[in-house]
């Protein structure tokens, strides 16, 4: 077999037929030869491929179709040839389907390819070439990309460098937006076979573009062009890169590249669309339409068709052929992918032109979804939603426009749109937005503020109650409109009329009715059909009480527009105000009969209110009442069906429920309405009525009062009457009376108020007269009020308002008042008698009180005089004591002189048991103590070193005699245990020199030793007095103890003398230098005397530890005081008195003592004298 021919073996011979490839016969002839010779299948396939290479596709298909049936399979490995035949024919059908533009033909081709591949699967399923072909077929179908991926993957597992599989995987990765993965597959294919066709470089270039590596993409496209100068894809890629540079030279280069591509392939849709886009910016719209239409018809790819339709649509759009533009925009949206939203933007504009804002909004929403922060889209959507009646959409618009103003703060249109949205919900925010727009106009744009904006700002200030600001802006708007009228007189005159009407409304609010009326009439002269002016003039007349004039103005409005609902509503309200329910009902029914206003909410509510009002009139026809309730309820329900948020209808339903007796349900309805808004006074009143019906009078009163404060400024007599009724029902008649009298001040001629005042006066008077505890003044006042009530009822029974209450009831109440007045004299007499009895009783009580007061004054005076006398006696005793002290000092001086003489003569004359010193012992014997003890005593606390001092002299201790047996326990104690130490002043320790101890007599030495041991306790006797006084009872421990206990006490005092000495040094202070010694008439020796002193010392030590204070009246700075000698028994009482006086008063030279100690010593002077003595 030669290279340019093929041999066909003849059946049953060794001969062959040689067919030269350059001279292949017709396909049918070849088929007949092959059939006749029963040729093997692989020869059929080889001949078919040669026909395909020569472009004879029909013969190629015929041969393969015949080979499927007539090919000889009687040889080894024929299955592979059989599979190759089926796959080759299927691959051809797939290729034809990719090129086919007719959808039906394309579908047929795909069906045939599917059938062939299915047959091949049954022969050898996992052949690489079969899997590759099938995978490419799946790629063509588009929705079987995962199957194709799996088959390419299978092939690569068997043959990692299979280039078709690598390219297939690259294609799938690119479509899945895995551009890096796609690029890796392309690179691997290129490394495997560097001689790959240019399309591999083209694929790499697209991957580089998606990865934003534009320079590498440019290199890849350039290399593809080098490999294949007619590669249209590479030319288009380079052209797009050049056009995106947005420079004149680059754009020129890009267009030249597109022109080359167009020359190579005039039917390439990508080239055609890019050229159409170029000519659109060149404003050559005819070429745009020609190229785009040509591109549309030369592609079956929907994305390319969408691009073509978009180019066509916008060329028609810019030429204002909106119907054609709409058609192509719509068609582009049908073909476009989700990421291509430009056709939706154009289609939305077309919907706006057609007035279909709903569809327009949907289109722009799709654009905004793809580009969330697109400025133009947000602005258009904000403007569309701003005009919507749906509050949710208005809120969306507000959000969009706020974003727009944040991105572009100088966009005046966006600020104005935002202000218009905020007008309904946020007046202050709207004013701020208008202010920003005004500032931008004046500063950035250098333009005058339009009169429309000034008028809107004035209207906003009017709504806020800033009437002065509103007037300023209205006048400025009028001036601006007059200035602008030169350019467009008709438009700006219309603005002037609107602003003038707003200014007239402002004058109404400012109570300048004359100015308002003048402006309304001026407008009507120029524009007689301005209905609102007639209505406002009528409303002003109605507010003045001129109902007939108001009716005339409303009828004037009806002459202009016979079906004007506002005019009929105002006339109907006039009838209702005059309680003409029938005519008023007809007016509102007329409004509802008109087709345009058949579901007018206001009229339906008014009708419901008319039926509800009939329920307030007393009637005995229960059926009629129930019928009216059902009608009112049905109307209110209808209103709620039309407008689910209508609060007035809900309030009406609550009122009907209350009339039916469902008070709890009615209260729930009213409560929900009040939660929704607190600006409807009727809801507050209805809630209060419900509280009254439920007997919750306190809550009702609070609700009525809150309603008066919030809505009526305390001047609405109707609400005041409701309040009075609640007070009357809860029994607060006085508050009820005051409330009604306030209402009478507002409406003095109101007969219902007069009736209620009379009724309350009657009830108050009745309660006072029946109360037997009422005094004469209250009874007389009640009779007076009862007479007034009688006059009121008598008057009302003759000239009362029959429509508001029953005159017979007034006459009945008048008779009842008359009956009460006839019984009043009895109550007056009773009260008068009771009053006289009370007066007598009060007089008697006053007299007794006066006597008691005088008695108390007398007792106080006597007490004062008695205290004065006692004080005087104390002063006299003090004087006596001072005198005696002086005498003692003189006597002490003589005694010291005698002592000095005796010392000079020798000490042997003293006797052990008696002598001079047994009769008188001088306690001022610190001079005889050892020096060491004296120093030790100086270390004591300052309170114990203090001495008491008399006004200028030194105090000597007095000798004390043994008291008689008949005295108190303290004196008995002195008899047994020795004298109780008396308070003494400490000596001046620093100025005295210690005398030599050997000069003392032997008897004195023993006493001094004993005295030194107990010296600290002797001075604590005064502290005992303070303790007694503080405790409030006399302390007499010695007198309380029995005779049997005394020896025990003595023994303990002797054994513990050392401890007592330590205690007196540590707890009560350092030991004193002075001591007291007294001779005992019953004892001949010193020893019993010592024991007695120790026992007393121990007791006083313990007491001084408890007290812990320095003696009262002691001076810290007096060092000149000296210890005094004991006085005789005859001086006992004077000393006691002077001691008390001195401790209570203190001398003039002493420092002021603590007040508590002085008071204690004064109080304890009488009780403590026995102990201290």
UniProtKB/Swiss-Prot annotation:
Q: Where is the composition biased (Basic and acidic residues)?
A: 1023-1034, 1160-1173
Q: GO annotations under biological process?
A: blastocyst growth; blastocyst hatching; cell surface receptor signaling pathway via JAK-STAT; cellular response to lipopolysaccharide; chromatin organization; endodermal cell fate commitment; inner cell mass cell differentiation; interleukin-6-mediated signaling pathway
Has the keyword tRNA processing been applied to this entry?
A: no
Enumerate the UniProt keywords alphabetically. Answer: Nucleus, Phosphoprotein, Repeat, TPR repeat, Transcription, Transcription regulation, Wnt signaling pathway
Query: Where in the sequence is Phosphoserine found?
Result: 932, 941, 943, 970, 1020-1021, 1037, 1039, 1041, 1079, 1083, 1085, 1095, 1100
Record's function text: Component of the PAF1 complex (PAF1C) which has multiple functions during transcription by RNA polymerase II and is implicated in regulation of development and maintenance of embryonic stem cell pluripotency. PAF1C associates with RNA polymerase II through interaction with POLR2A CTD non-phosphorylated and 'Ser-2'- and 'Ser-5'-phosphorylated forms and is involved in transcriptional elongation, acting both independently and synergistically with TCEA1 and in cooperation with the DSIF complex and HTATSF1. PAF1C is required for transcription of Hox and Wnt target genes.
Q: What is this protein called?
A: RNA polymerase-associated protein CTR9 homolog
């Amino acid at each position: 077999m030669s290279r340019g021919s093929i041999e066909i073996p003849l059946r049953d011979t060794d001969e062959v037929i040689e067919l030269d490839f350059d001279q292949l016969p017709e396909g049918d002839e070849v088929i007949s030869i092959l059939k006749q010779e029963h040729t093997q299948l692989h020869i059929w396939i080889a001949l078919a491929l040669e026909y395909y290479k020569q472009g004879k596709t029909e013969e190629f298909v015929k041969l393969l179709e015949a080979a499927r049936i007539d090919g000889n399979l009687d040889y080894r490995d024929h299955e592979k040839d059989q599979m190759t035949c089926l796959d080759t024919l299927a691959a051809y059908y797939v290729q034809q389907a990719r090129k086919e533009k007719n959808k039906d033909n394309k579908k047929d081709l795909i069906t045939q390819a599917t059938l062939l591949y299915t047959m091949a699967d049954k022969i050898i399923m996992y052949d690489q070439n079969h899997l590759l072909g099938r995978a490419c077929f799946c790629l063509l179908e588009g929705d079987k990309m995962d199957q194709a991926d799996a088959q390419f993957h299978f092939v690569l597992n068997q043959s990692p460098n299979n280039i078709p599989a690598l390219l297939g995987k690259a294609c799938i990765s690119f479509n899945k937006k895995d551009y890096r993965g796609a690029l890796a597959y392309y690179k691997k294919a290129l490394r495997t076979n560097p001689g790959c066709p240019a399309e591999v470089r083209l694929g790499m270039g697209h991957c580089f573009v998606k990865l934003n590596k534009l320079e590498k993409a440019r290199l890849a496209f350039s290399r593809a062009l080098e490999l294949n100068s007619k590669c249209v894809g590479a030319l288009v890629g380079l052209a797009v890169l050049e056009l995106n540079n947005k420079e004149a030279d680059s754009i020129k280069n890009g267009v030249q590249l597109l022109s080359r591509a167009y020359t190579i392939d005039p039917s390439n849709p990508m080239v055609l669309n890019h050229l159409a886009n170029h000519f659109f910016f060149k404003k050559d719209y005819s070429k745009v339409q020609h190229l785009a239409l040509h591109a549309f018809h030369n592609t079956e790819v929907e994305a390319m068709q969408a691009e073509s339709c978009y180019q066509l649509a916008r060329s028609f759009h810019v030429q204002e052929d909106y119907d054609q533009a709409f058609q192509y925009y719509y068609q582009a949206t049908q073909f476009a992918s989700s990421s291509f939203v430009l056709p939706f933007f154009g289609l939305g504009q077309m919907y706006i032109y057609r007035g279909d804002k709903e569809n327009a909004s949907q289109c722009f929403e799709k654009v905004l979804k793809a580009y969330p922060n697109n400025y133009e889209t947000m602005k258009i959507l904000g403007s569309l939603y701003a005009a919507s009646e749906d509050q949710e959409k208005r809120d969306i618009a507000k959000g969009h426009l706020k974003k727009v103003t944040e991105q572009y703060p100088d966009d005046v249109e966006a600020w104005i749109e935002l202000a218009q949205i905020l007008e309904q919900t946020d007046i202050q925010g709207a004013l701020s937005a208008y202010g920003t727009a005004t500032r931008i106009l004046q500063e950035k744009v250098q333009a005058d503020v339009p009169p429309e904006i000034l008028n809107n700002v004035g209207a906003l200030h009017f709504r806020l109650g800033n009437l002065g600001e509103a007037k300023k802006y209205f006048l400025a708007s009028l001036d601006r409109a007059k200035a602008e009228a030169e350019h467009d007189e008709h438009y700006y005159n219309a603005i002037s009329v609107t602003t003038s009407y707003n200014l007239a409304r402002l004058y109404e609010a400012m109570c300048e009715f004359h100015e308002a009326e003048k402006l309304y009439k001026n407008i009507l002269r120029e524009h007689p059909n301005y209905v609102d002016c007639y209505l406002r003039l009528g409303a002003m007349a109605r507010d003045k009480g001129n109902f007939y004039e108001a009716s005339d103005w409303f009828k004037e409005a009806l002459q202009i527009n016979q079906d004007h609902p506002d005019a009929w509503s105002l006339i109907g309200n006039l009838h209702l105000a005059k309680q003409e329910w029938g005519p008023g009902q007809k007016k509102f029914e007329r409004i509802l009969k008109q087709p345009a206003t058949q579901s007018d909410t206001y009229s339906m509510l008014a009708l419901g209110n008319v039926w509800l009002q009939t329920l307030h009139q007393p009637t005995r026809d229960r059926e009629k009442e129930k019928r009216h309730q059902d009608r009112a309820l049905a109307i209110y329900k209808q209103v709620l069906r039309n407008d689910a948020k209508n609060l007035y209808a809900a309030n009406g339903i609550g009122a009907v429920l209350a009339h039916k007796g469902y008070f709890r349900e009615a209260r729930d309805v009213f409560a929900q309405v009040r939660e929704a808004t607190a600006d409807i006074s009727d809801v507050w009143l209805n809630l209060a009525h419900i509280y009254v019906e439920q007997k919750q009078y306190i809550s009702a009163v609070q609700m009525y009062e809150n309603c008066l404060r919030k809505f009526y400024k305390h001047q609405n007599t109707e609400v005041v009457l409701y309040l009075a009724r609640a007070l009357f029902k809860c029994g607060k008649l006085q508050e009820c009376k005051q409330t009604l009298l306030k209402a009478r001040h507002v409406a003095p001629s109101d007969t219902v108020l007069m009736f209620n005042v009379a009724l309350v006066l009657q009830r108050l008077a009745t309660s006072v007269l029946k109360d037997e505890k009422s005094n004469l003044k209250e009874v007389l006042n009640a009779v007076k009020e009862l007479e007034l009530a009688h006059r009121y009822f008598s008057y009302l029974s003759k000239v009362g308002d029959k429509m508001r209450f029953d005159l017979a009831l007034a006459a009945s109440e008048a008779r009842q008042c008359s009956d009460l007045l006839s019984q009043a004299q009895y109550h007056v007499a009773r009260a008068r008698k009771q009053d006289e009895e009370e007066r007598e009783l009060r007089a008697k009580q006053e007299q007794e009180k006066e006597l008691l007061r005088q008695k108390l004054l007398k007792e106080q005076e006597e007490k004062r005089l008695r205290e004065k006398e006692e004080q005087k006696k104390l002063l006299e005793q003090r004087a006596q004591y001072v005198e005696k002290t002086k005498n003692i000092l003189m006597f002490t001086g003589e005694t010291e002189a005698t002592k000095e003489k005796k010392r000079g003569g020798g000490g042997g004359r003293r006797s052990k048991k008696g002598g001079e010193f047994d009769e008188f012992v001088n306690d001022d014997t610190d001079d005889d103590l050892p020096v060491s003890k004296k120093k030790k005593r100086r270390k004591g606390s300052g309170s114990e070193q203090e001495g008491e001092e008399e006004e200028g002299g030194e105090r000597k201790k007095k000798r004390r005699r043994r008291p008689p047996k008949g005295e108190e326990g303290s004196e008995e104690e002195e008899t047994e245990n020795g004298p109780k130490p008396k308070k003494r002043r400490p000596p001046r320790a620093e100025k005295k020199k210690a005398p030599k101890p050997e000069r003392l007599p032997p008897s004195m030495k023993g006493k001094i030793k004993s005295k030194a041991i107990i010296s600290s306790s002797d001075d604590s006797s005064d502290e005992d007095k303070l303790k007694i006084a503080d405790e409030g009872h006399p302390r007499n421990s010695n007198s309380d103890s029995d005779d049997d206990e005394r020896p025990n006490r003595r023994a303990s005092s002797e054994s513990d003398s050392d401890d007592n000495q330590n205690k007196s040094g540590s707890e009560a202070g350092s030991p004193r230098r002075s001591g007291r010694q007294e001779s005992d008439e019953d004892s001949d020796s010193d020893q019993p005397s010592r024991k007695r002193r120790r026992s007393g010392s121990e007791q006083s030590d313990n007491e001084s530890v408890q007290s812990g204070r320095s003696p009262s009246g002691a001076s810290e700075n007096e060092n000149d005081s000296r210890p005094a000698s004991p006085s005789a028994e005859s001086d006992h009482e004077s000393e006691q008195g002077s001691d008390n006086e001195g401790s209570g008063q203190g001398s003039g030279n002493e420092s002021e003592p603590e007040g508590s100690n002085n008071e204690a010593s004064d109080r304890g002077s009488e009780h403590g004298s026995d102990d201290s003595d």
